[in-house]
């Protein structure tokens, strides 16, 4: 559910929103969003999640959609558009929470880096998850819901601590590991390890990891 960037969003807001609306309409009742939602090959997905590619969800589709909606609000100041998608936003967050395995506070599952199999606890999505929580906090502030703000802040602190403890090896974020932190793959330096850091800074939400670690 990737936007074509700041220019596309800023100057073609309605076109950008039409894409976000399509992904929202194709959201499964469980809260996940598919990569190929229907319009990619054969036609539009229908409202309520009926699409030709059932059950092909990826974690970062939900995260990307959430982040884009908040970025739209911050670019336009349109609270009503954000509120119109609030039910879907909460459903997508509930889905992401459901993907947390026992002993972990970071969702586990496939992502759009789908060309080969990745470790369960994956440095790319760990950072994106932290940015998703930054976005959820911004949603709470935008609509005046302190419970969302508090939930997002507490979850961010917990998940960030876990990511640093399990994935940071003193030089870079390891490719990934098992949910309990075992079998950490320090022999692979994955180029997408700071994707969440980039997204958060681009959106103006600050760092998801300490800057001394990022610069390492």
Please provide the spans of the model-predicted regions:
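An acidic- and aromatic-residue-enriched active-site/binding cleft used to recognize and process polar
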Residues: 28, 38, 77, 101-102, ...
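Residue position in alpha-helical solenoids
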Residues: 139-142, 166
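Aromatic-rich carbohydrate-recognition surfaces in CAZymes
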Residues: 1-109, 118-140, 153, 193-196, ...
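Short beta-alpha connecting loops at secondary-structure transitions
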Residues: 111-120, 141, 180-186
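Short amphipathic alpha-helical segments with heptad-repeat character
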Residues: 150-153, 177
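Acidic, serine/threonine/proline-rich low-complexity intrinsically disordered regions
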Residues: 141-150
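Extended ligand-binding clefts on enzyme/binding-domain cores
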Residues: 1, 5-10, 162-216
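Short amphipathic alpha-helical coiled-coil/interface segments
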Residues: 152-164
């Amino acid at each position: 559910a990737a936007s074509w960037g700041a220019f596309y969003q800023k100057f073609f807001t309605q076109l950008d929103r039409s894409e976000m609306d399509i992904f929202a309409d194709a959201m499964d009742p469980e809260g996940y969003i598919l990569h190929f939602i229907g319009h990619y090959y054969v036609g539009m997905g229908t409202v309520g999640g009926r699409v030709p590619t059932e059950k092909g969800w990826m974690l970062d589709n939900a995260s990307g959609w959430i982040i884009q909606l908040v970025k739209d609000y911050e670019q336009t100041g349109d609270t009503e558009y954000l509120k119109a998608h609030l039910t879907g936003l909460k459903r997508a967050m509930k889905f992401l929470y459901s993907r947390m395995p026992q002993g972990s506070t970071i969702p586990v599952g496939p992502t759009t880096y789908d060309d080969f199999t990745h470790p369960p606890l994956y440095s790319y999505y760990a950072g994106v998850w932290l940015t998703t929580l930054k976005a959820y906090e911004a949603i709470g502030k935008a609509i005046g819901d302190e419970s969302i703000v508090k939930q997002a802040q507490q979850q961010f602190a917990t998940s960030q601590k876990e990511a640093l403890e399990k994935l940071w090896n003193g030089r870079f974020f390891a490719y990934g590991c098992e949910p309990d932190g075992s079998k950490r793959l320090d022999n692979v330096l994955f180029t997408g390890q700071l994707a969440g850091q980039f997204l958060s800074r681009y959106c103006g939400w600050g760092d998801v990891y300490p800057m001394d670690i990022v610069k390492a």
